[in-house]
């Protein structure tokens, strides 16, 4: 957790997750990574775009981390047409130390599930018997437990319970429907 002392987010506590992103595919790849979290209290959290918080985390960790601030900085430099899909490029063999930033979790939450999409190209479009368009993709789930005291959450650390790949199907609705 981090609590910035300066900037617009001063005094607010954020939880963050450091992870490594590595391209071992044999070719440069474009990706669109989405990281969300859900508590056992059914509250959901998204990876936030907070440059000042990312800088505070980098100071706390003592190393550079790639996050949403870096992604949007690169996006800003692209032409309007290239910005449309907001993909990020990672070169073959490249390894990035990254950070995802979340608002503080509820004090009473004991279990958190991190959901990551965009790590796999295992995606298929399905038209079901009712004519609906469905997208089935492979997602990564990380199940965490937060043992500890609800009054001293800043001292808590998370325990990895298990990680798994899962297929998820979502209905896609188009604007003209």
Region locations from a protein language model:
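The feature marks short-to-medium sequence segments in extracytoplasmic or secretory-pathway proteins
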Residues: 24-91, 125-150, 161, 171-177
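Short, solvent-exposed loop/turn segments enriched in Ser/Thr/Gly
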Residues: 12-18
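Low-complexity, acidic Ser/Thr/Pro/Gly-rich terminal tails and inter-domain linkers that flank the onset
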Residues: 1-12
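Short, surface-exposed ligand- or partner-binding patches at beta-edge/loop junctions that are enriched
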Residues: 104-126
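Long, low-complexity ectodomains and other extracytoplasmic segments of secretory-pathway proteins
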Residues: 155-157, 164
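Generic beta-strand structural signal
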Residues: 17, 96-98, 110
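Short Pro-Gly-centered flexible turn/kink motifs
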Residues: 89-100
């Amino acid at each position: 957790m981090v609590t910035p002392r300066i900037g617009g987010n001063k005094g607010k506590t954020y939880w963050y997750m450091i992870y490594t992103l590595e391209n071992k595919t044999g070719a440069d790849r474009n990706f669109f990574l989405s990281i969300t979290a859900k508590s056992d209290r059914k509250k959901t959290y998204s990876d936030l775009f907070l440059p000042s918080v990312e800088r505070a985390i980098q100071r706390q960790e003592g190393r550079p981390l790639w996050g949403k601030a870096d992604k949007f900085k690169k996006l800003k430099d692209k032409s309007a047409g290239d910005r449309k899909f907001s993909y990020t490029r990672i070169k073959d063999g490249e390894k990035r130390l990254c950070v995802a930033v979340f608002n503080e979790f509820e004090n009473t939450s004991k279990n958190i599930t991190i959901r990551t999409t965009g790590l796999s190209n295992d995606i298929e479009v399905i038209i079901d018997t009712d004519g609906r368009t469905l997208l089935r993709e492979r997602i990564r789930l990380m199940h965490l437990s937060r043992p500890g005291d609800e009054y001293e959450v800043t001292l808590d650390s998370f325990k990895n319970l298990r990680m798994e790949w899962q297929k998820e199907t979502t209905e896609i609705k188009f604007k003209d429907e």
